[in-house]
């Protein structure tokens, strides 16, 4: 077990060289909570549980260094906490910053709040739909979403923020180019593509300065 944890720590350090032992311990605790709760509610696919560390935790961790200087994050459709809880753990180490989690499923909300309480994370969960969150929180610096909806739908949902100064970091799979092309039918935006460090077929789309083609 100790050897396995050290191996995981080295994998994390390869991505974020200055991660503390305490942060690593929080990530391991989060991993354990996912496995424990996943037996009762569907947080992640059962087929991916053996690859939880790489497929979900490291995949989420690569988001944070892109804008580690930012202090107000918001994750949409947080589900099992990827990437939101991982980002919250890094913000905890930084000792400043906050992330808001938006989730409509009550059971997943209960899980997320349990993790946040047990790990004492700088995060707040809002049990609501994305469309309703704009009345609850101020515009964040960064929006994240992982496997939530098509790019066109995400831009529609988040336009109230993205038309301002908010930046979106959206994790997408092999069909991302098609999603971008479809989105251009309705939107104009600045786009920067970051290749995933975990999956060669995946990317992180950095989107800003969104404008509607409909005026």
From Swiss-Prot:
Cellular component GO terms held in the UniProt record: cytosol
Any one Gene Ontology molecular-function term assigned to this protein's record: rRNA (guanine-N7-)-methyltransferase activity
Keywords: Cytoplasm, Methyltransferase, rRNA processing, S-adenosyl-L-methionine, Transferase
Primary localisation category: cytoplasm
UniProt-listed Enzyme Commission number(s): 2.1.1.170
Catalytic activity: guanosine(527) in 16S rRNA + S-adenosyl-L-methionine = N(7)-methylguanosine(527) in 16S rRNA + S-adenosyl-L-homocysteine
UniProt cross-references to Gene3D superfamilies, sorted A to Z: Vaccinia Virus protein VP39
Residues noted as binding S-adenosyl-L-methionine in the record, renumbered to the chain: 77, 82, 130-131, 146
HAMAP family from the UniProt entry: 16SrRNA_methyltr_G (MF_00074)
Protein task: Specifically methylates the N7 position of guanine in position 527 of 16S rRNA.
Family: Belongs to the methyltransferase superfamily. RNA methyltransferase RsmG family.
Name this protein carries in UniProt: Ribosomal RNA small subunit methyltransferase G
Source organism of this protein record: Bartonella bacilliformis (strain ATCC 35685 / KC583 / Herrer 020/F12,63)
Gene this protein is translated from: rsmG
């Amino acid at each position: 077990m100790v050897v396995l944890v050290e191996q995981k720590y080295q994998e994390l350090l390869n991505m974020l060289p200055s991660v503390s032992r305490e942060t690593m311990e929080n990530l391991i605790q989060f991993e354990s909570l996912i496995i424990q709760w996943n037996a009762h509610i569907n947080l992640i696919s059962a087929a991916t549980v053996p690859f939880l560390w790489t497929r979900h935790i490291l995949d989420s961790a690569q988001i944070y260094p892109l804008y580690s200087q930012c202090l107000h994050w918001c994750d949409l459709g947080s589900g099992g906490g990827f990437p939101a809880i991982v980002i919250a753990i890094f913000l905890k180490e930084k000792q400043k910053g906050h992330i808001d989690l938006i989730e409509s499923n009550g059971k997943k909300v209960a899980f997320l709040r349990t993790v946040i309480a047990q790990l004492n994370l700088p995060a707040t969960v809002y049990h609501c739909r994305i469309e309703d969150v704009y009345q609850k929180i101020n515009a964040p610096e960064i929006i994240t979403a992982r496997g939530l909806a098509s790019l066109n739908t995400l831009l529609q949902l988040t336009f109230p923020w993205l038309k301002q100064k908010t930046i979106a970091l959206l994790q997408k799979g092999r069909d991302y180019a098609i999603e971008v092309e479809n989105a251009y039918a309705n939107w104009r935006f600045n786009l920067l593509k970051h290749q995933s460090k975990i999956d060669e077929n995946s990317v992180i789309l950095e989107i800003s300065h969104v404008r509607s083609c409909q005026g």
